[in-house]
Amino acid sequence: MPNITNNHTFNIVQLSDLHLTGDIGQAPSYQRFLAVFQTAKHLNPDLWLLTGDLVNDGNSDAYDWLFNQLQATKIPYLAVAGNHDVTHEIGIHLAHQERIHVPILPDRRLKNCFRYTFQAGHDWQILLLNSSVSGEIFGLLTHETLLWLDQTLTTHFEQTIIALHHHPTKVSSDWIDAHLLKNHQDFWHVIKKHAHVHTILCGHVHQVHTLHPLPAHQVQLLSCPSTDRQFMPFVDNFQIADTPAGCRMIQIDNKGIVSSYIQIVQNTHSFCLNNAN
């Protein structure tokens, strides 16, 4: 179990919605990721946490490239699937409702029903859930996954962070809220029973949100910017936002106090130009 010493924090860097596609290591999505990743390395992470939509077309070579980048840092990493990791989207130049979605198998290195523990003032656990559905954009947690979550929280009382791809609460954007976690009420029914759930991390929305969905519960829901492109928040129809890529830092000090901030990277476009050879 990783542990922190006095006057240090346990630092989790959340990376999400990479959408790696095109020439491996060279295409713009790779270069934008590398710009964010190089910045994130200087944040002294103790864990890389990737919350889905890593690769756009299921290319195993793209996953190999990504996981080689992570392994080279010698820092532990965890990753869950997003809808694009289990769905090949054909016709990306078309309107969303006109695209064809073909089911694909997830990479075997993506986690589901996985428990990771560390110490930071108190004992902590991170629970990874697969919310992706092959051939679909929306999310769903299977009965077996919800049962595992409930049983794990019942038998392990560590302070808990849960990571999944799909947002389990609406974010006031109609088009992306149509593709949230479909059985979110079942998910929250489990969470309500367990006061030691502290933070839920998600991707999918390409937006930054801090929400408190359960007024009588301490739990906070944090979403993460994409390392690729951002979606315009608080609009009913799909729009790309002219805002920087980035990642989320979650810090837990030796008193068990959690803080978080967004690290943005302004020069991803310049990074693409400088490395597109």
UniProtKB/Swiss-Prot annotation:
| Region forming the signal peptide | none
Top-rank taxon: Bacteria
> Which residues are listed for AMP binding in this entry?
H19, D53, N83, H84, H206
* Top EC class for this record: hydrolase
What SUPFAM superfamilies is this protein classified in?
Answer: Metallo-dependent phosphatases
- Where Fe cation 1 binds, per the record, is at D17, H19, D53, H206
What the entry lists under Pfam families is as follows: Metallophos
Q: Which GO molecular-function terms appear in the entry?
A: 3',5'-cyclic-AMP phosphodiesterase activity; metal ion binding; nucleotide binding
Catalytic activity, EC: 3.1.4.-
What family does the Swiss-Prot or TrEMBL record give for this protein?
Belongs to the cyclic nucleotide phosphodiesterase class-III family.
- Name the record gives this protein: Probable cyclic nucleotide phosphodiesterase MCR_0369
